[in-house]
């Protein structure tokens, strides 16, 4: 594939390495739990869920990581301060090292989570998701005062989905922000900015999404990733077509997994792969591409950080 001329930063959080040259480190897989209408959740406001089922899902991911050598992170989604605190409390109780994203559609919930992580001493594992053009001052203030030092920085430009638009939102601002998102992150005390390219739907910027992966890595030298599976889930034609088929999931899943592999081969350092229930499909596929990236890295003179545990060694 390729090697970047610009030095590529590597951020290590909870033993997980984000970034580097393609193939230098295994691709990080980010599962999502407690998302909207997640079957294991019985009360989204209070954060009541089936703990046994949640732990089974999590242990499956741990086992697949052990088998493949791929690192993992958990994205914890909550819609109220009460629920996200409960989810975080559960997660840090069963796993004392793995980093996790704190995520919500509401800024006050993300702020409450950052504050809670600081209070209970796990802010060094927390990744704020995200710093974006719609962030409000109240969230900025709480994040600045917290001990959280890592954040997803979202390259979503509401008025310009092109590669240039993504660069602009990161560097100069827009969509109501007078500063670039990377500058906002710096002022919040973020030492480890991890860029999310903001995956766009097919026909509305999906090409620019993939092209932005090597472009942004080449320009900023920072870890790059995104929720590429959203390109498949937002595909109107596929949504309609799969309903006409006897096995809709069999039609859908190859496209869901495929979006991640396209981005991975383009240099994406991490993949927000969506529901943790898809863990069995995503790990072997991503490991396969990591073998290709590892082989190429060797040919290009890139030193693989942990060769023994990289899929290129572990699975061949």
From Swiss-Prot:
It catalyses: 5-methyl-5,6,7,8-tetrahydromethanopterin + coenzyme M + 2 Na(+)(in) = 5,6,7,8-tetrahydromethanopterin + methyl-coenzyme M + 2 Na(+)(out). One of its GO terms (molecular function) is tetrahydromethanopterin S-methyltransferase activity. It comes from the Archaea. One of its GO terms (biological process) is methylation. It is an enzyme of class 7 (translocase). InterPro entries: Dihydropteroate_synth-like_sf (IPR011005), MeTrfase_MtrH/MtxH (IPR023467), MtrH (IPR028342). The complex is composed of 8 subunits; MtrA, MtrB, MtrC, MtrD, MtrE, MtrF, MtrG and MtrH. This is Tetrahydromethanopterin S-methyltransferase subunit H.
